[in-house]
Amino acid sequence: MRPGSWRVITHYGFTGPIQRLQAPLRRSLARAAALSTRSYATIPSAPSSQPTSQESSPAASASASASAPATKPRPTYFKDTTLASLDDFIANQSSAAPLAPSEAYTLRTAQVGPAGKKRTITRLPEWLKTPIPSAGANPEFAKIKADLRGLNLHTVCEEARCPNIGECWGGSNKAAATATIMLMGDTCTRGCRFCSVKTSRKPPPLDPHEPENTAEALARWGLGYVVLTSVDRDDLADGGARHFAETIRRIKQKKPTLLVEALTGDFMGDLDMVKIVADSGLDVYAHNVETVENLTPYVRDRRATFRQSLKVLEHVKNVRGKEGIITKTSIMLGLGETEEELWDALRELRKVDVDVVTFGQYMRPTKRHLAVEKYITPDEFELWRQRALDMGFLYCASGPLVRSSYKAGEAFIENVLKKRASERVVSEALGQAVAAEEATSAKSA
């Protein structure tokens, strides 16, 4: 091809050298070639053998040609076939039998990838699909998000890509809305193979204003129950335990009636750091074992072990007493665990008096993370919920979209905490009354 010349080549078969044509003219030529070779889905009706009076009239022909559009309308291709009409659907709706679980929970597959390299993937089950949250559709969602940005706070809801963010942030009222604040930044020193939080050996330093900003945000929202969590900070001497405890104390100072749940790491097994957080005034101490013991080395960071997590949960009870605090943990299903391994994990948790356990479906955040071995059906989640309750757990939230800080369990836990608090008040009042009566009797004698 000579320098300075152009060649238009289209998939319609039109080729030819064109000398320095402008883009609009090249597009016009390509459009003309397309219209001359395009096949339409709709087939025009055969022309009538008998011409009408309008066809025989030159004036009518001129008028029709003047009013005709310059380009042909874009055709519509119908590839799907309708199985039943609307009338048939309405008539059979009342008599239609419900789907069997095997039919309702059938997983769909799809072929993806370029031609010749296609692979089969499993579609996300229908029971795991949630609507995309919108700040415009829910003012409470927008308010919480704006407050977080203004105070430079992070949430595990966003960092871990939680599917419940629209439901928890968009509660119908302030008491229903929940956000799990993630302390000590958004960068973790560990690299668990299921988690999408950023990792680094040297995260940014702690924000000294974070405890006050967190307390201010929570007081502004007017919540009754809040969950605090954090990234692991193995780069700090105390693992961030004092920062965590200071945040809880600030919250309790601003709003003593606010119930606080702290979801902490294992502090590298340092039980003194666990005690610092447990003694800070929180109401629920949560620490997740994440999976069964046999899968822990493959799922969690190698610095975390199943037995180390059990020691953390056990030590909290030793510090605060069995009735003085609620302990909580969470297990992901769908990572390849067996039924017997799950039974063993629950038995070990009961041995250290864990009160609450939650089960949720593991969902792969990105292709770099562990693949999902199995999608657990809602019926299976319900089965494990009942099994956990039968084993003596105080409460169990179990479902495909349940997460460790899922708000569904918080209402129950909140009621338990309030009931225990009222019982303590009654017990103390009764003790004081008995002591006063004994003192009066002693004086009389």
UniProtKB/Swiss-Prot annotation:
GO MF annotation, one: metal ion binding
Catalytic activity reported: [[Fe-S] cluster scaffold protein carrying a second [4Fe-4S](2+) cluster] + N(6)-octanoyl-L-lysyl-[protein] + 2 oxidized [2Fe-2S]-[ferredoxin] + 2 S-adenosyl-L-methionine + 4 H(+) = [[Fe-S] cluster scaffold protein] + N(6)-[(R)-dihydrolipoyl]-L-lysyl-[protein] + 4 Fe(3+) + 2 hydrogen sulfide + 2 5'-deoxyadenosine + 2 L-methionine + 2 reduced [2Fe-2S]-[ferredoxin]
Cofactor or coenzyme needed: [4Fe-4S] cluster
Note describing how the cofactor binds: Binds 2 [4Fe-4S] clusters per subunit. One cluster is coordinated with 3 cysteines and an exchangeable S-adenosyl-L-methionine.
Record PROSITE patterns: RADICAL_SAM (PS51918)
SUPFAM superfamilies tied to this protein: Radical SAM enzymes (SSF102114)
Enzyme class (EC, first level): transferase
Binding locations of [4Fe-4S] cluster 1: C157, C162, C168, S405
GO cellular component: mitochondrion
Radical SAM core domain ranges (all copies): 171-394
Keyword terms: 4Fe-4S, Iron, Iron-sulfur, Metal-binding, Mitochondrion, S-adenosyl-L-methionine, Transferase, Transit peptide
Pfam families per the UniProt record, alphabetical: LIAS_N, Radical_SAM
Top-rank taxon: Eukaryota
Protein family membership: Belongs to the radical SAM superfamily. Lipoyl synthase family.
Name this protein carries in UniProt: Lipoyl synthase, mitochondrial
Native organism taxonomy: Eukaryota, Fungi, Dikarya, Ascomycota, Pezizomycotina
